Amino acid sequence: MKKVNVVAIGGGTGLSSLLRGLKIEVGRSIGRLSAIVTVADSGGSTGRLRKIYNIPAPGDIRNCIVALSDAEELMQKLFQYRFKGDGLEGHAFGNLFLTALTDITGSFLKAIKETSKILKTKGDIIPSTYENVNLVAEFDDGKVIKGEEEITEYGKKGHKVVNIWLEPKNPKAPEEAIERIKEADLIIIGPGSLFTSILPNFLVPQIREAVKESRALKVFVVNVMTQPGETDNFTAWDHIDTFLKFSGIDLVDVAVVNTQMPSNGLLKKYLEQNQEPVTPDVGRIGREGITVYAENLIGESGDFVRHDPQKLTEVILKILENELLSKV
């Protein structure tokens, strides 16, 4: 099998799950793996550090570095460690580490590269912008809300997003991100929070235009569960349709959709939190000319239902073989 260049775009736990599976294929079917990650997060440890040090959000970057890490498990646990007690309470060690390295090197991009070396990542992590941006959304009642967490919370009141942008407007993307998109054979979008993890990347004009112009196969991985305040009652097609509407991207070639229901116990817990499995309306997606891969993709861990990294990777490999390599 020819080795291909893969670019994954997103943020949050969804992107981390995808990367955790894909890293095993680096050096096998994947020649180069690059993650382009949102830095618009404004909550928790990340939000506090952004306000104090005026840096892009380190949280999703940290999660992706750990997901791609080939370092000892202890190092991975260290970077995910959260402090308790007064002063540092809630801060992740990795966030503090990236913040300190940004100050030492004078560059957020350099800090990511040096941290990636220390954790021996099997791929490159690149922020979608190196600017300190904030996500802003206008809702159907005319209200304008700033900040990822705040947008999701306002959405829980039943309001729908009608417009979304970054401030400052037109932030610049790292040149490396544009180059990786241009050289990609496969671009994977998602999984992740639609409005607050995936779309912010495409609100960076250079990222959006590079993806639009790319001849790579574009794959959209649909979330397995709806998210309160963002995708309430969304079907699989609703996720794709909303992405296309707000991202400015013309099309996706392939959609990956989960067909498996969670176990009864976990399903009950999710329903109590106003979350439900995303309906796999495969026929509706197919009518748009999008090839659909619909399979059992979930993994259950504790109280969470997420994409299983191995199952998701197996589907991506199938897509590579059927949609890309067989047509070369």
From Swiss-Prot:
Keywords: Cytoplasm. SUPFAM superfamilies: CofD-like. The keyword Transmembrane helix does not apply. Its main location: cytoplasm. One of its GO terms (molecular function) is LPPG:FO 2-phospho-L-lactate transferase activity. The lineage of its organism: Bacteria, Pseudomonadati, Aquificota, Aquificia, Aquificales. This is Putative gluconeogenesis factor. NCBIfam families: CofD_related. It comes from Aquifex aeolicus (strain VF5). One of its GO terms (cellular component) is cytoplasm.
